[in-house]
Amino acid sequence: IKVVNISFGTFNKEGNNKKLIEAVELLWDMGYVIIAAAGNNGPEYGTVSIPGSSKKIITVGALDDNIKMIVNGRITKNYSGRGPTKECVQKPDILAPANGIYSCSNGIKSGYSYVPKSGTSMATPIVSGVICMILGINKEMSNIQCKKLIRNTAIDLKMEGNRQGWGKINPEKMVN
């Protein structure tokens, strides 16, 4: 295992989140690529969820949150968590598609095994998958090199930094 996908988060106001941040940063320091969702509490400043607020890890926001969609059972738009964090770190780091991504379902409500879902929890596995693809090509690449590759190949969307981070993930350029 080299990549850890974290498609969940907690609110900054909840209990003792220091241990969660410490745990993901320990994994990062051990060489794992940690990729976490920015959360769906935007669009206000300082709404990136924990552990996505960690300065070390890669935090993923929703590329297409400007379209009305159902997220966590409510109709919303402009929901992607935005920085800066309490430590004045600009987040998210990167954006990926988050609208209508097919994912597993328990089938109870829908009767289907897969259903479309939306949110930063759906965008995060896209980035994790791209990183896995890159590591398949270059197995010796470090987590820091992965983060730099994402940054250096991102498509700048000309949005505020606390909205887009480095921009949209660009898998094609990452491979070339």
Give the residues covered by each predicted segment.
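Substrate-binding/access-modulating region of protease and related hydrolase catalytic domains
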Residues: I1-K56, K86-V89, I108-T124, R163
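Catalytic-core environment of secreted peptidases
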Residues: D65-V71, K77-M122
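Hydrolase catalytic cores
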Residues: K2-V4, T47, A98-Q164
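C-terminal domain-closing interface element
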Residues: N12, Q164-N176
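Solvent-exposed loop/turn segments at secondary-structure junctions
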Residues: T10-K13, N40-E44, D64-K68, T85, ...
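Structural detector of well-ordered beta-strand residues that form the stable sheet scaffold
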Residues: V33-I35, T59-V60, L95, Y102
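Conserved beta-strand scaffold positions in the cores of enzyme catalytic domains, especially
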Residues: I57-T59, V89, D93, K168
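Structural recognition of alpha->loop->beta junctions
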Residues: I50-K68
